[in-house]
């Protein structure tokens, strides 16, 4: 999931959550080692701006306990008042779109967030995740069923709900009386709202039993995989090398069946390794002439796509290049950016660095370049 630079997230956490039982407000309660609010904020890692609304009496606590690049805004008397204050804090900031999320939904996945972003990027002025109603619906009075109701066309709303900033801010200002959620205000303002896929695990913590369910989900969901990759290519005659997708002038080239991008090959194998899916040679055999001279981004894209097909998100990639020359440092930023584009993650989740072997071995004799890579995958 790539997050546009002009997108921001708003996380609402100014409510008191009295239905969740006695104790502190639910957003401050612990959930598997972190507060509910910390988990909700972490779900939006990589957003250029994250605005969190808090009750005025919680502002000092927010400053003390919430880490990361978040902006705190004092909430109002109602949820709508709080959201409007957060929206107004983004005016004139260059933000074009905003995703508004309930702070009491700490288990929202990158897949759900990505679905909203994709709809907005496709031109929808508003988009929100939801799940179709599958249970039978009844009407009841005094503890007795009085009628049934059709569930056709009914959905259970979730967050984050995404909007063009100007449009949703205008809707809030035009309807200060508020609404159940921001989609309701958007509909009143005449904005079409696209429904995107929701997730059963994206529950809103409302009742005491919801916390136990969330703990169970987290216990089942912590599927983290690490993969390592290693590759070596010898030097040959030439005037440039490809390293992590960047063409670097050099007095030699790297020898290989494809474009010999040693860094990209190591990262590709790291992803395959984390998935227990072999290596590049298994998926793109060097005996197959169609891969002669192929650009290595083809291999890396395939590995990233396979990860997503198997239900994993790439959380982090770390590549180390081992060589005396060429000097990698001046190009490391461009390399990390190129790799992030190929595997579909934020640039700050990719690291490219270099070291030497202190003139020892084949890299020390400048006979070639080696690379080591590590990839971290998390079940989405």
Curated annotation (Swiss-Prot):
Cross-referenced CDD domains: CDP-ME_synthetase, MECDP_synthase
Catalytic activity: 2-C-methyl-D-erythritol 4-phosphate + CTP + H(+) = 4-CDP-2-C-methyl-D-erythritol + diphosphate; 4-CDP-2-C-methyl-D-erythritol 2-phosphate = 2-C-methyl-D-erythritol 2,4-cyclic diphosphate + CMP
Region span, 2-C-methyl-D-erythritol 2,4-cyclodiphosphate synthase: 225-380
UniProt keywords, alphabetically: Isoprene biosynthesis, Lyase, Metal-binding, Multifunctional enzyme, Nucleotidyltransferase, Transferase
Protein's GO biological process: isopentenyl diphosphate biosynthetic process, methylerythritol 4-phosphate pathway; terpenoid biosynthetic process
EC numbers on record: 2.7.7.60, 4.6.1.12
Residues bound to a divalent metal cation: 231, 233, 265
Family matches, as InterPro entries: IspD, IspD/F, IspD/TarI, ISPD_synthase_CS, MECDP_synthase, MECDP_synthase_CS, MECDP_synthase_sf, Nucleotide-diphossugar_trans
Pfam families xrefs: IspD (PF01128), YgbB (PF02542)
Chain positions covered by the region annotation 2-C-methyl-D-erythritol 4-phosphate cytidylyltransferase: 1-224
Site entry: Transition state stabilizer: 19, 26, 257, 356
Co-factor requirement: a divalent metal cation
This protein's pathway: Isoprenoid biosynthesis; isopentenyl diphosphate biosynthesis via DXP pathway; isopentenyl diphosphate from 1-deoxy-D-xylulose 5-phosphate: step 2/6; Isoprenoid biosynthesis; isopentenyl diphosphate biosynthesis via DXP pathway; isopentenyl diphosphate from 1-deoxy-D-xylulose 5-phosphate: step 4/6
GO molecular function: 2-C-methyl-D-erythritol 2,4-cyclodiphosphate synthase activity; 2-C-methyl-D-erythritol 4-phosphate cytidylyltransferase activity; metal ion binding
PROSITE patterns: ISPD, ISPF
Site (Positions MEP for the nucleophilic attack): 151, 204
UniProt function note: Bifunctional enzyme that catalyzes the formation of 4-diphosphocytidyl-2-C-methyl-D-erythritol from CTP and 2-C-methyl-D-erythritol 4-phosphate (MEP) (IspD), and catalyzes the conversion of 4-diphosphocytidyl-2-C-methyl-D-erythritol 2-phosphate (CDP-ME2P) to 2-C-methyl-D-erythritol 2,4-cyclodiphosphate (ME-CPP) with a corresponding release of cytidine 5-monophosphate (CMP) (IspF).
Family (UniProt): In the N-terminal section; belongs to the IspD/TarI cytidylyltransferase family. IspD subfamily.
Name of the protein in question: Bifunctional enzyme IspD/IspF
Organism: Paracoccus denitrificans (strain Pd 1222)
Gene that encodes it: ispDF
